[in-house]
Structures are given as structure tokens and as C-alpha cells.
């Protein structure tokens, strides 16, 4: 455990310190002991970035209210000790004053560090920095047995360290994570490259990932947007400390539309990290927030993903969207909210299929490679999400709904996507609806390795099983 915040330095205003953190841990343990022995252990957490339904429980949950902050930042070592339920919004606010940031900052402000590690996260730095769990140095985990253990890549809990990513709280909950940070300058310069063919985009993206540059200029961030089969873009970001004018996409202007309108742009590093949050990528259009007249009166503090989540929750509770569709005489709609990864050489294949079969646009693209060298050894070092080191993948995100076809089985579009992803040697994140059968799920998400960890760290099955949670919605 880092001594930063304990010895040698006064805490910065956004750092809570280890003493306050221990109070939160003690409260967590007390809440664990208060949960009936025959009840599943869950978080008493009102917010979530998951898009899959789950069964309700009347049992009390884990009190994580004291585990929401940054414990301490060590600017010299470029590390931070962070509570598991700390949001990236708060984490970035604590590290940017030092000129530092997490190696990967997922796109939405209310994603927590613990959530990104146990459930995966990604962003435009992932082609050089991998996934959030790869910059974790050590992690304190409350296991299903009610014990807090510290897992590192080399200690007696190394297998838990490897198996924790993509376990979604079924092996335990993180209470503290020690993570690496990287230096960041104040600004990011952007280039938007247009492509009329997704195969040309695939080739260019692959070359940029390999060279980490384009047209003689360094590339620090890389993602893309597909608007149609004949209009797609890669956005190349370069860190810079050069002063100059910057754009603001928290007001009337909309970031994803700027990609179609400008070839170059500049943002502060803060606004770049949160460029997708203001309009929840493009999903704010579902609430009318992109209509100029509505946007003009929409309170600026409520142009953020966390508020749109509240609107989604209201819709789920009262079936507002389904009611409106029925009044229009339209069929019900199937939610298709997914992030998948395919090898980069299969990107165009998947996009061709998707644009032909699933009427959703735009589509987000984000290349990634596991870090080299990997923090843990093995041909597939993270067994619950077994991507291969040395291989480039592309995360493809799409978040909307499609009309239900007459006579189609439940989840027909999502099932078709799962089949196509598997056929292309890809993987699918588990934050949303999944329809795999038990055998296929085990083959894709850890199988025997997961079962062994479950027996060790949750021997009484106090926590839900991953298949029960991700597919059976328990």
C-alpha cells in the first residue's frame, strides 16, 4: 500500500486519505455481516452503467458510500490509490491538476474505476495502453467469503488478479485499486479523416496502430465513427502543450457532428476526455437534446450521460417508449446496446454484415491492443476475456433499438450479433443483454478458470454466478 497521503505530504483537496478510506471499508464489512446468510450479496448502489435487467432483491446491500473517492495521488511515482466506487469524473479531477491522467479513461463520467476493471472499459488510448485493468498494480477485493485480500500480479492472489477483469462482481468487489498514471499536456489536437469505404478505413487504422503515427505526425488517441457504408471517419488525437483556441462541445455545438464538419480541431485535455459524455455519444438525440430549440433551453448541467440515464430509468419503469410506438401503430422494439471486439482484419467484414442486417447508425470504432509486455504472463493473460497479446482488435459500439420482426424469437437481433461475433473470432462485453447457452458462455468467458476462482473466493456462493448475472438476469 502506498504511503502517499499517510507520510510525507499533505493531502490535496480531492484526496481523502487512507484513514477516511479505512472508515469506509469498516462500514462495508459491517454491511456484509448484516446481509442474511441465505441472501445473495449485492451492492447497495442506486446508479449503474449496465444495460441488462436484473432481478430485484429485498435483502440489504453492501454499503459502499465510503468508497467513492481518490485516496491519494503520488505525482512522482505517477500512481494513484483509488476507492473502488470512485467515478472517473472524480478521478480525472484529482489527477489533472498534477498533469496526470489514468492510462485509459472510459467515455462516460459516472463509470467507476472498480466497474471498469471488473466489467471492462475502453477509450481512444487503448491502442497503446490496453484496457483499464492492465494499468492496475494491486487491488483490494472484498471476496464472497467476506474477507478483504490484496491481489497483485505476483502474490498468492495472482490468479484472482488475472480473473477479476470481466467478473462483474461475481468474485468480489474492489475496495481499493492502485493504478498507473501518465503525463498529459493541456491540449489535444485532432484530425478527422474521411473514408468512403470501410475497408480502406480498416487498412489505415491498422497502419496507424502499428506505426503510432500518420502522415509524419504522432498519434496518441485513435477512434472512429461510421455514419454509413460510404461515410466513415477516423479521429486522430495528438497531445500538445501549444496554446491556442479550443472548441467547446458542452453548449450548442455537438461533438460527433463536428467530425463531419471539420478536418481539424483542438480541445482541452479535460474536454477531450469527456467529449462523448455531453451527448452520450449521439444517444441524446433520443430525448430531443440535439434539436436546437430544445438544446437552447436544456440546462447545461443536465447535458451529461448521468442525466440521460435517469430518463432511461423512467422509460424502463413506465414503458414510455413502447407506449408511444404502440400509439403510432409501430411494432415493439428490441434494444440493441452492445460493445463487441473483433480482430482488426475482420472489422470491415463485421461492419458490412451489420450495416446490411441491423438498421443502426452511427457506429463507434475503437482499436485496442493488450499492453506489451503484459502485466501478467500467458498466451491469454486475462482468462475471463481472453484477448490475445500482440493482436489488434477493434471495439465496435452500437446503442439503439430495432423493430421486432413478426414471429421472431426474443432477442433475435442480439442473438444474430452474438453468432456473427463468434464467427469472426471476436468477443462481446457483458454490460448488456446476452443470450448464450451455458456451454458456449463457459467457452467464451473463462470456464474452468472461473469455476476454480469461484470455489476459492466465494465457496458458499454468496455472490451471483457470472452466467446467472450476465445471461439469466438474476
PLM features: what roles do these ranges have?
Residues 1-474:
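Noncatalytic alpha-helical scaffold of FAD-dependent oxidoreductases
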